[in-house]
């Protein structure tokens, strides 16, 4: 496990470049800071300043090396690097509320932006006019879209929103996509077609995060009522739901076809598995508890406490987890959704942690990634 404290401010979101030498983070404001790995240090090498509202989403395309950002200013920008300088291109989102989330498609020829305008902007590059344009998916979304994830076929798009529902839409754009093959989610995929809908008003909560499995047949999501759910399209859209005893989870991602990692307000990542019988099970918290020791507080810590907690005393508010506040995002660091070897978390404590499954397996008895 390696933990790096970037900031005192929360890290809103992050994204890695292809070779994992650079990470782009938003320090809870209108900027994106890019840090480069230099030995054991992370050195700030770029600041992207074009938004005039809080940045809410970052994604870094591994093949084309382009960054897309979105923010509360209702804008999205595609950033391309030329001669060592990042240049922004404005995207026409056509929304009247804040953008909340952004994600490149697997082929990197389009991206999707969720927003408070109760719609999803699917954006693609129009070469004749040399600009990024968008098409809207509106119905039947009834509230803010909080999270998105692309199916491996580059066409289907999962969305979690504040109306307690998780939906799968077709984001097929004839200008850039080849006609998609049939999937367990359906065969006819005109743009905006809703392929599936899960959840309801009677139960559930805001859907904070969604994730397709590597095959695209399974879809996981976490809600504000502390539930983890998995829908399996290959099993007639059957849904398995696990009501956990934990605080709400904010981020979820598949780390193998049947295992997923989720994290949130409990400040540590957790492993869940989904078996062939359609049963969803909590396996373990993936944290190594710190040894609590009594010690004298240094002058440096006294000043840090004044900044962080508005107090000069050491009241032993330190959590036993590595992260000292809620985890806001989980991402794969080494490997992919078929076989993840390391994953990364960032949180409100301004820290970034890289977790190694091999190290975790040696500490946690009986831990195996299925």
From Swiss-Prot:
One of its GO terms (biological process) is Arp2/3 complex-mediated actin nucleation. Its main location: cytoplasm. This is Actin-related protein 2/3 complex subunit 1A-B. Probably functions as a component of the Arp2/3 complex which is involved in regulation of actin polymerization and together with an activating nucleation-promoting factor (NPF) mediates the formation of branched actin networks. In addition to its role in the cytoplasmic cytoskeleton, the Arp2/3 complex also promotes actin polymerization in the nucleus, thereby regulating gene transcription and repair of damaged DNA. Component of the Arp2/3 complex. Belongs to the WD repeat ARPC1 family. The gene is arpc1a-b. GO terms for cellular component: Arp2/3 protein complex; cytoplasm; nucleus; site of double-strand break. The keyword Cytoplasm applies. PROSITE patterns: WD_REPEATS_2 (PS50082), WD_REPEATS_REGION (PS50294). It is found in: Cytoplasm, Cytoskeleton; Nucleus.
């Amino acid at each position: 496990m390696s933990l790096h404290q970037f900031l005192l401010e929360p890290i809103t979101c992050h994204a890695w470049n292809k070779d994992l030498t650079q990470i782009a983070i938003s320090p809870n404001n209108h900027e994106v800071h890019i840090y480069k790995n230099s030995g054991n240090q992370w050195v700030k090498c770029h600041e992207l300043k074009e938004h005039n509202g809080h940045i809410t989403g970052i994604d870094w395309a591994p093949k084309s090396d382009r960054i897309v950002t979105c923010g509360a200013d209702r804008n999205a920008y595609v950033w391309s690097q030329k001669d060592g300088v990042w240049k922004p291109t404005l995207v026409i989102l056509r929304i009247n509320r804040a953008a909340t989330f952004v994600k490149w498609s697997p082929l990197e020829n389009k991206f999707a932006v969720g927003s408070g305008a109760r719609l999803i902007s699917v954006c693609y590059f129009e070469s004749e006019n040399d600009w990024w344009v968008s098409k809207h998916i509106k119905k039947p979304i009834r509230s803010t879209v909080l999270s998105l994830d692309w199916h491996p076929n580059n066409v289907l798009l999962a969305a979690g929103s504040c109306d307690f529902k998780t939906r799968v839409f077709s984001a097929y754009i004839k200008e850039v996509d080849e006609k998609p093959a049939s999937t367990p989610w359906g065969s006819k995929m005109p743009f905006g077609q809703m392929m599936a809908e899960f959840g309801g008003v009677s139960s559930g909560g805001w859907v904070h995060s969604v994730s397709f499995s590597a095959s695209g047949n399974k879809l996981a999501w976490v809600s504000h009522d502390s539930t983890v759910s998995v829908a399996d399209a290959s099993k007639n859209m059957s849904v398995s739901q696990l009501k956990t005893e934990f605080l709400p989870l904010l981020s979820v991602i598949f780390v193998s076809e049947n295992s997923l990692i989720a994290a949130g307000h409990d400040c540590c990542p957790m492993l869940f598995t989904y078996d062939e019988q359609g049963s969803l099970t909590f396996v373990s918290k993936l944290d190594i508890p710190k040894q609590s020791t009594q010690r004298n507080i240094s002058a440096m810590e006294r000043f840090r406490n004044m900044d962080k907690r508005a107090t000069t005393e050491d009241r032993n508010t330190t959590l036993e987890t590595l992260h000292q506040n809620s985890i806001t995002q989980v991402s794969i660091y080494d490997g992919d959704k078929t076989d993840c070897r390391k994953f990364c978390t960032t949180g409100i404590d301004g820290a970034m942690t890289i977790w190694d499954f091999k190290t975790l397996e040696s500490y946690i008895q009986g831990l195996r990634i299925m």
